[in-house]
């Protein structure tokens, strides 16, 4: 049994917003697609231009990256040298201990018996160095004291030059020179006392060395190879230790430079991100396409190109056609007005007859719209 057909005038209309079943006018569809493609291409080109401008206007990134690479290479090189220096120091230390232990086994107990003499010699040598340093400080304090006294003499001459008037400049200079004399006098007395003290200690250390040398003469001669070798090895170890310390300081400085370069790159990245965020906010606040009226053209000036105006008009038409898919929207219209403002009553009457024929036959609904550019 065949299905019951509906009334002849009943037409099943598409829901608003659904896809249109009928084909869109080929020229309008092409114009809409070309307009959309043009807008996408313009946005892509604008983004690319913005990125190129940012790269061109901010060359600091390349400079900081070069510094970062240099610092990284320097750190790697210095760490390799530091590892080699530490390995050499440990090797020399182990070899020194082995040689000294072997020599101590050969010489026997004379090393321990002669050790006070060599310890006294070491203390006497340190006392001599302290005495020399104290003497230099005392001489410098004496020179400063003499210069301060000379300044006081000059200031007194300036103050007493004019007996009828007291010059405040010379008075201030005299006060300043007097303070310098007092400070220099205190430093001279302090350095003199220190020099006397270390000189006395040096004399005592030298006297002790002489006493031990007389009492331990045979043991000193017998154990001399051991202590001479020990002094040589200590000198070599001190040199390697100084090199290790120097390399450690160099590595620390290189790492500080590397960290500073990373910090600079982070700051540059934050600045670029802030600029991009601000640019995106400004672009979102920009008026939409066609919202602003075109500026009036003055005499002697040319307006915008005809291609640009046509493109904007066609884009608006295509958007309207895509939105007006519902026939109910067309039924509510009492008049159909062309794009140039002229009334199209004949088109409306023709369209009514076509709709009546379509309803009588139950065929598909067709929609014709007059477009005048």
From Swiss-Prot:
Q: Enumerate the residue ranges of region (Disordered).
A: 1-36, 274-308, 332-373
Q: Which residues form a coiled coil?
A: 35-98, 170-258
**UniProt signal peptide:** none
| Gene Ontology CC terms, in alphabetical order | cytoplasm
User: What keyword terms does UniProt attach to this protein?
Assistant: Coiled coil, Guanine-nucleotide releasing factor
Q: Identify the InterPro entries for this entry.
A: SH3BP5 (IPR007940)
* BP terms from Gene Ontology: intracellular signal transduction
Q: Name one GO molecular function term.
A: protein kinase inhibitor activity
Query: What sections of the protein cross the membrane?
Result: none
Record bears the keyword Coiled coil: yes
What domain of life is recorded for the organism? Eukaryota
> Which Pfam families does the annotation name?
SH3BP5 (PF05276)
Q: Where is the composition biased (Basic and acidic residues)?
A: 332-360
User: Which family does the record claim for this protein?
Assistant: Belongs to the SH3BP5 family.
PANTHER family xrefs: SH3 DOMAIN-BINDING PROTEIN 5 (PTHR19423), SH3 DOMAIN-BINDING PROTEIN 5-LIKE (PTHR19423:SF8)
> What this chain does, per the record?
Functions as a guanine nucleotide exchange factor (GEF) for rab11a.
Q: What is this protein called?
A: SH3 domain-binding protein 5-like
Give the gene that encodes this protein. Answer: sh3bp5l
